[in-house]
Regions:
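Membrane-embedded alpha-helical segments of integral membrane proteins
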Residues: 34-98
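N-terminal membrane topogenic signal
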Residues: 17-29
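Auxiliary, metal-adjacent structural segments of Zn-dependent hydrolase domains
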Residues: 175-243, 247
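Pan-zinc metallopeptidase signature
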Residues: 319-384
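Transmembrane alpha-helices and immediately adjacent membrane-cytoplasm interface residues
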Residues: 88-94, 107-141
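Post-HExxH zinc-binding segment in Zn-dependent metallohydrolases
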Residues: 154-156, 265-310
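Membrane-interface segments at or immediately adjacent to transmembrane helices
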Residues: 132-202
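Active-site recognition of the HExxH zinc-binding catalytic motif
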Residues: 73, 250-271, 275-276
């Protein structure tokens, strides 16, 4: 006997209710997290709303979290990640045993999948709120008022030479080991990090923030395997850095992660503000490291634009600078593995999900900003 569409609808509702009753709290959490993510995807087209959220709500939260966690002598972010990994492994182990040894495997498997989905979506929803909004509000160029005009090869060459000369000047103002490589005191670099942005804040109030120190990661070698020199953790508002990477790179990495801590989300802009703050700070370790970072970005662009000009500038590099650049390249070549490739693929996918590319205009945002900002200084230096 045909029950009719109304009876079929009632049956479906009872079925859905029965499924929901298997783990109601987890279903609610899953739906709430999915709702937050959906709202974020819809709202991110509203630039004004994203600006108000990022500047008026999230940055104050970051300041409070950063100041709170500054009292902890280790990376709270690393501790949370380690606990999460251990907790996940333990949870999966227990659930695997229960699936094998206890009845109602189908229901248990369903609850497990809902639990994992709810956990993943909740973390991602919080990430959208605590960091994703920065990608759709005002970027550093908009907040600072800096121009990012198209640049010529002549300008690129001049600024590349300027930073090469700066690296040459500071190469012998940093500590070096018996083999001639930079061996700056890593702990001292971290100790000085709260003051790195002090001078830059005066010119760019949009970068103002509490003077917080970057934190070294205990499992830094793991970061090297996944090609990370540092990361900003929005859940604790900490700037975390890889302490195993070459000493010549550390100070610039610290400044880069501190840029994220001060609301600069885009990677290319964070590279620029890292160089800017380090040079304004004036400390030899920071100036040298930032000069290497700037030269690397500019040199890569110049290599493609005018190879002869690049060769001329490279030939003028101090032996100590060349040694540090080559040592850094050798270090990272050791980690050229499928794990690193997979990590880079995931990270590139993450950037693309937030409509971010590695560059703007012809050479990339970092290069364009460096050339536009430092071209006048480069000309003045060349005429001295």
């Amino acid at each position: 006997m045909y029950s009719g569409p109304m009876e079929t609808t009632k049956t479906k509702k009872r079925g859905l209710a029965a499924i929901f009753a298997l783990c109601p709290a987890r279903h609610v959490l899953l739906l709430c997290a999915a709702g937050v993510i959906a709202l974020h995807l819809l709202a991110r087209a509203d630039h004004a709303l994203m600006r108000r959220l990022s500047e008026g709500a999230v940055r104050p939260i970051h300041r409070a979290l950063g100041q709170l966690n500054a009292h902890v002598p280790f990376s709270v972010a690393e501790a949370l990640i380690a606990l999460a990994v251990l907790g996940l492994l333990g949870f999966l182990g227990v659930q695997a045993v229960r699936l094998v040894t206890r009845p109602e495997r189908g229901r248990r498997l369903y609850r497990l999948l809902v639990t994992l989905a709810a956990a993943v979506l909740t973390v991602y929803a919080l990430f959208c709120l605590l960091w994703g909004v920065f990608y759709y509000g005002d970027d550093f160029m908009a907040r600072s008022g800096l121009k990012n005009d198209p640049i010529s090869t002549e300008q690129l060459t001049a600024v590349t030479r300027y930073f090469a000369d700066l690296a040459n000047t500071y190469a012998h103002r940093v500590a070096r080991d018996d083999s001639g490589l930079c061996c700056s005191d890593r702990a001292e670099i971290l100790r000085k990090s709260p003051e790195v942005f002090a001078a830059t804040e005066e010119e760019f109030p949009c970068l103002a923030g509490p003077p917080l120190a970057a934190k070294g990661i205990f499992f830094s070698r793991v970061m090297s395997y996944v090609d990370f020199t540092g990361f900003f953790f929005p859940f604790t508002a900490e700037a975390n850095v890889n302490m195993d990477s070459p000493a010549c790179d550390l100070a610039a990495t610290v400044a880069h992660e501190l840029s994220h801590q001060r609301g600069v989300a885009k990677e290319q802009e964070a590279n620029f503000t890292a160089v800017l703050a380090s040079l304004r700070y004036g400390d030899s370790d920071y100036v040298y490291s930032a000069s290497l970072m700037a030269y690397t970005h500019l040199g890569n662009a110049l290599y493609r634009a005018d190879h002869e000009a690049w060769e001329e500038i490279f030939a003028g590099l101090d032996e100590a600078v060349v040694a540090d650049l080559r040592a850094s390249a050798r270090y990272w070549a050791r980690f050229d593995t499928p794990v690193r490739t997979a990590s880079n693929t995931v990270y590139e996918g993450f950037l693309q999900s937030y409509d971010q590319t590695l560059g703007l205009k012809s050479y990339g945002a970092c290069v364009d900003l460096l050339v536009n900002y430092y071209y006048g200084q480069a000309l003045a230096s060349a005429n001295d």
